[in-house]
Amino acid sequence: MNPNQKIITIGSVSLTFAAICFLMQIAILVTTVTLNFKQYECDPPATNQVMPCEPIIIERNITEIVYLTNTTIEREICPKLVEYRNWSKPQCKITGFAPFSKDNSIRLSAGGDIWVTREPYVSCDPGRCYQFALGQGTTLDNKHSNDTIHDRTPHRTLLMNELGVPFHLGTRQVCIAWSSSSCHDGKAWLHVCITGYDKNATASFIYDGRLVDSIGSWSKNILRTQESECVCINGTCTVVMTDGSASGRADTRILFIEEGRIVHISPLSGSAQHVEECSCYPRYPGVRCICRDNWKGSNRPVVDINVKDYSINSSYVCSGLVGDTPRNNDRSSNSYCQNPNNEKGNHGVKGWAFDDGNDVWMGRTISEDSRSGYQTFKVIGGWSTPNSKLQINRQVIVDSDNRSGYSGIFSVEGKSCINRCFYVELIRGRRQETRVWWTSNSIVVFCGTSGTYGTGSWPDGADINLMPI
């Protein structure tokens, strides 16, 4: 074979090998793409709103005669449907409540930068739960914490953290507020934030991080709202707001809000005489609230909200074991479903209850006169029978030697039912503890359980002598 023939033969063989390698590279690439796209294949999106897609990176390092290195294929993940919550599942059947969360904010404040807060609450989006509180514009170990017993200042803001995370310096300040309510409609958060002068406050409605609407004070006397979660059904959120006397006749209105925009306002109707600081929960197809009568009754008002036609009805919890503080002792307390009981009605505390057929679950302080201790129980016939007093399944949440405060309800949707949970505000500092100049709180949270449970007490737990003054 002459030199030219050798060159031609070697060239032909090289070209053949190169062609084979090229074809194998194409085959490997096609196989990789096909397998990955089949693995993540999804149905076409429905007409509902979808979440923005995010790129997914697939990397393969393959060695096969030639080197195919860091092949990157970008594609969109399957669209995730986002729907309004309708809360149509039944309420979970429970035997009592089990411990869920405790943030220990005051104990942590002894050695860390933790916000001074009050009026805490809990609310959940479809994926996780968050704790809220009204901050005082200062941390506890800061001279600005002096005299933070006052409720309404321009420095107060609504704080939001994942449940169980204390309000540290990196906490998000959602809005300016000395009274608030928050809820998630399935697509985004709604925050109702009230601030301003007592005689001319403003309520801002913030939806999906944007200010959408507002309303000014209608009675020029401390416009205020729930201090716990609002409720959204099929895109319509309801929030109870009051403007007027805290110890006399006031003007309560129920606002209906869609994606941050006020679409309707209904006046309070029914037999409730005074309504403040409502603890609301979904009772499909409507919303039900248990509130505070700060004027005439130590029995709690009930507000029923019809989301479809905007109608309102109100009454009082029937249980003769009443829920407010101060109150008469259980032997002499009364409630007959329709009217305030005129028993130590002036003053009170935010609280909660919820119906369970003809019965009622409720929480209240252990003390009849002060915000000390906390207990829960079920009253047989307490929702439907006037002055019913048969109590079962009592639990102590905070023993009577320790302070409590506000409490409220929030709802969590499970696979088959809607569970009811509650939080208790554990107030520390002034007025009772005069060694320090600040007033703040931590929280403890319990949720309904169908299982068994033990006993205990979950107070704030901070030694006031170890705290900054």
From Swiss-Prot:
It is a single-pass type II membrane protein. Residues 31-469 are virion surface. Residues 36-88 are annotated as: Hypervariable stalk region. GO terms for biological process: carbohydrate metabolic process; viral budding from plasma membrane. N-glycosylated. The chain crosses the membrane at residues 10-30. It is found in: Virion membrane; Host apical cell membrane. One of its GO terms (molecular function) is metal ion binding. It catalyses: Hydrolysis of alpha-(2->3)-, alpha-(2->6)-, alpha-(2->8)- glycosidic linkages of terminal sialic acid residues in oligosaccharides, glycoproteins, glycolipids, colominic acid and synthetic substrates. Substrate binds at residues 118, 152, 276-277, 292, 371. InterPro entries: Glyco_hydro_34, Sialidase_Influenza_A/B, Sialidase_sf. Its cofactor is Ca(2+). Inhibited by the neuraminidase inhibitors zanamivir (Relenza) and oseltamivir (Tamiflu). These drugs interfere with the release of progeny virus from infected cells and are effective against all influenza strains. Resistance to neuraminidase inhibitors is quite rare. Residues 1-9 are intravirion. Homotetramer. HAMAP family: INFV_NRAM. This is Neuraminidase. It comes from Influenza A virus (strain A/Swine/Kanagawa/2/1978 H1N2). The lineage of its organism: Viruses, Riboviria, Orthornavirae, Negarnaviricota, Polyploviricotina. The gene is NA.
